[in-house]
């Protein structure tokens, strides 16, 4: 049987991968957005694991709010990536400071 500790270890590994991806890759904006989403999903997994362990639905309801914010963040982030690519022809983070208007 898979216990609470297994879910928490998996969540910690996913969180660590997301943070490591942010620190390792600082140039590609799309990879940075994917790492942020990985971090949010790791946090959601921990909320679900604790919610199931404590038999309380508050954690699962909170996950829906986090998913809503993550979807909005992804949509805005991808819109910025598309605008950056159309204007500059690349999706490097260094090109963000040159966007004006």
From Swiss-Prot:
Listed EC numbers: 7.1.1.-
Domain of life: Bacteria
Catalytic activity: a quinone + NADH + 5 H(+)(in) = a quinol + NAD(+) + 4 H(+)(out)
MF annotations from Gene Ontology: NADH:ubiquinone reductase (non-electrogenic) activity; quinone binding
Keyword hit for Membrane: yes
Topological relation to the membrane, as annotated: Multi-pass membrane protein
Keyword Chloroplast: no
Pfam family, any one: Oxidored_q2
Transmembrane annotation, as ranges: 4-24, 30-50, 61-81
PANTHER family: NADH DEHYDROGENASE SUBUNIT 4L-RELATED (PTHR11434:SF21), NADH-UBIQUINONE OXIDOREDUCTASE SUBUNIT ND4L (PTHR11434)
Subunit text: NDH-1 is composed of 14 different subunits. Subunits NuoA, H, J, K, L, M, N constitute the membrane sector of the complex.
Physiological role: NDH-1 shuttles electrons from NADH, via FMN and iron-sulfur (Fe-S) centers, to quinones in the respiratory chain. The immediate electron acceptor for the enzyme in this species is believed to be ubiquinone. Couples the redox reaction to proton translocation (for every two electrons transferred, four hydrogen ions are translocated across the cytoplasmic membrane), and thus conserves the redox energy in a proton gradient.
Protein name, as recorded: NADH-quinone oxidoreductase subunit K
Organism for this UniProt entry: Alkalilimnicola ehrlichii (strain ATCC BAA-1101 / DSM 17681 / MLHE-1)
